[in-house]
Amino acid sequence: MISPLKNKDSFHEILNSEPFFLLVKPTQSIYTNSIESDLVEQEIELLIKAGFINIEISWSNNENWLNYVSNLRLKFPKLNLGSASIRNKKSIDDSIKTGCNYSMMRGWDRDLLNYSNSKNHLLIPGIKHLKDLKQAIELNCKIIKVYPVKDNIELINISQYKNINFIAAGGLSISDIPLYKSLGYKAIVIGDMGFKNNKIDPKIYEWLRRRSN
């Protein structure tokens, strides 16, 4: 298992060894119901024991999110913990405050990227248009998420960008890893297909067990 990244360069190491990120979208009941919250934490603990640490939490603009993610950071210091659906400066500030190692944008926002860079916080842009991809590269982005990837797989030919690490996202499951790895993506983001109704897809555990054998 790789230790949680201590700098941006370490993120590249994680991409080379771990082919997916699990996106958790907390429901209001996770914030307010300790039983549900404990169940999710048990699932995360099982993932860590299986050698998986790439968890990102969808950002919400409320105090409950801050408390929840801060608690995860304290309970699971080994997690490579990130925030997702980043859309404004407050979401960056909240991510830094809670100890997130990185964040991912849903779309492209040049000003937000510059703001995150000024805070020395790793923000991975979401790209769906070629013009946005070119802007991201001009700003020296070395890790870029293509979202939604199924709509853009033919529009964005990632093979021509040799020095960029691409992450695929949008409606993907653990079974999609071989396809997107073959297309040149370093990793994929698994959202609702991997975490739904506060439960992690059993196929993810199966995949992790096969990898460890």
Tell me the role of every PLM-derived stretch.
Residues 45-47, 160-161, 182-185:
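Short, solvent-exposed amphipathic alpha-helical segments in soluble enzyme
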Residues 23, 53-62, 79-87, 92, ...:
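Catalytic beta/alpha-barrel core
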